[in-house]
Amino acid sequence: MERSFSQVTSLCRKLDVPLVIAGDLFDKWNPPPQLIEFVAAQLIQLERVYAIPGQHDLPNHNYELMHKSGYGVLRTAGIITDMHPGVPYKIGDFSFIGFPWGYEITKPHKGSGMPMVAIAHRYIWTEGHTYVGADPRLSVTQSSILKHYTASFFGDNHKGFLWIRGKCSVLNCGGFMRRKSDEKSYQPSVGLLYTDGTVKRHPILTTEDVFHRNPELDKIVPEIDMDEFISEMNRLGDVAINFPEQILRYIDEHSLEPNVKEALQHLLLPF
């Protein structure tokens, strides 16, 4: 983790540019104090850090509870500038607008005359960078609102990609570092926005990463009927993996009575 962070902070200092984070700075809203301290020590090296929260940065995916989170600690300490939803921020030659988790991307007001850049935390996908059964409405090709922005940067989908059509560039940032053995072939990267509006991916070097093999696991895996396993997982969906997460997603995606929503969020707060 430290190697990945140091590459990013070194790159920002070398190019004299700010760092903009498209959400999910942490993988859960209540990270241990040691992790908050580590991230703070990395980001404090930079003069300008802008960010929006992802769902994992927020208790119960609730934007109003941000102050209780590790992300909220960094905001209160002044280590990051939290971008308020829909509010333009002048960063260099561009006007950046943040759309945290739960906020829809809207058409920008172009009164400033500056090129507009969207920073959003929501799932977006393209062919080869998604999962079976992904909502077609979330495909980058269906996001017509993005044509109003010179560039758009997304968090949430851990499979990074750069999609360009005409003068519109869309970067899904992807995972910042490889965390699991099934990501061994994945290339983490960060996005660079150039003054002419073009976007390029800059790789995070992983040559020093080490994946530890478990010989005992190697013996067990061949004995598993993968066809049966995959079939069962497809039947159960993500519910079998993280039930509380699915409840929170249901709350996000459906209109519930305020008292019902509040009760469910209260019950799931320990998770």
PLM regions with names:
Residues P32-P33, F99-I105, H158, G175-R178:
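Short beta->alpha connector loops
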Residues T198-K200, T207-F271:
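Non-catalytic terminal accessory segments
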Residues L19-D24, R48-H56, T81-P85, V117-H121, ...:
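Active-site neighborhood of phospho(di)ester-bond hydrolases with catalytic His/Asp-centered motifs
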Residues M1-V8, K180, K184-Y186, I220-M233:
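Cap/insert and terminal regions of metallo-dependent hydrolase folds
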Residues S6-Q7, K14, I97, Y103-K107, ...:
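A structural signal for the main folded, soluble domain(s) of proteins
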Residues V39, P53-S143:
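Conserved catalytic scaffold of divalent metal-dependent phosphoesterases
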Residues V132-H202:
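Conserved beta-sheet core of the metallophosphoesterase superfamily
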Residues M1-P88:
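Core catalytic region of metal-dependent phosphoesterases/phosphodiesterases
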